[in-house]
């Protein structure tokens, strides 16, 4: 099973992001961008990859432990950016800010507990909106159109909501894209 742990998105934020992506798609209608389906928007806390089903109880226990003592908290979704940078865009994302760095705390605790060798990379909470298929055709033209459209939306505030839980998700890859299924939810 292909698994990850995520913070799911409020419907009002999902709708605002869907509208922003529709604007971006009109401004940069390029087939080298693979847009994430709005129902799949989420904040990844930890990608686990292929896991045996027998590990699920230990994963749930790690989620409960990582979240112990953390109350529900506000998350704001605002602004757009790319990874790794505008010279080589591979992922278009919406920014996430939070009260108290709770997402970072949970993500680091999960990584320490569930990964054999933690990555050491800083946790950068975000919502992936699109990925660039490699190799990108017309990279310069795409970058200019995407950058211009994203800059118009960059200061946008897509909303905020109170995160009440995290979810263990299964990702099933299909020719039409990934299908995500909630396997278990752990309340804050």
Residue map of PLM features:
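Histidine-dependent nucleotide/RNA phosphoesterase domain, centered on the 2H-phosphoesterase fold
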Residues: 1-188
